[in-house]
């Protein structure tokens, strides 16, 4: 027992500092991946907290970090959007479908561990491993380009929404708006306003090639050559920061990288990444530099900031989602894809850490830990996750 305690506490200082570094690095990533998936930032933070904690205790590879990841988030976008479309506006049904999908994803991953399928990762050729690592590096680099951009505002001061035209809904002829299917007269057009002909109330306003609800200022349609189309929202319009702000941000990025790589041999007592984060954050705060923060990033994305408590059991999941064959048919394909991506990324990361440390992890145990973590995360309101090669 004494030897076990001695072994576990031999590097306690390095472990604490490394854990602090990873925690600070995970916050903005979890927030960003939550926005990618189309859910609240806290859903991403809950996933980072629960996945990371559970896999670190029960996983099969010491030194491997898990949390919300971009590879899973890009698959979740479609799931959340389709789920929301199945419910009433504002019901947020897509979020609950996401939780159910993550639970089923975890069950599939645990089955992979029980049937000892994790060992097959050893059969992956080395060139494939290198391609995986370099591909992820490119994806991570490209994902950072968005940090050098700012949201474009529309005519009403809100974030400008990018839209894609779908089917035609209405058309304009002789200053009158008609339904495209029935040719019924709907609105009168006066300048940029679409007016209810009965009570003369302004219902919609035209700004550029978009039609906005006059009350909520939310984009509802696209307009092209007197034809009005329904829309599919694809994101928030962005542009690169103004020159001075862009140069300031680039300077801080280069300073951070310089501390991490240029002074690594002088920073033996603490992780270089932690020192870089603390030093550059201190400069930005005490010099009162006008730069984006995690909080402002959340608000720019439509959130309200980092406000919330610990994750709680999602009792609403069982009343919101009908657990029948139709639900299974909807979430099963997403669960299979997410489970496969999560296990492949986790086991390839495990294999890479094995090579770096010249030790051997337990791939089947990692499958069980990843699956169990995702089940608990889904039940407690997280978006699920897997191993993160960058942090590991």
Q: What are the residue ranges of the model-derived segments?
A:
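Transmembrane helical cores of multi-pass ion-transport proteins
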Residues: 1-185, 189-201, 207-392
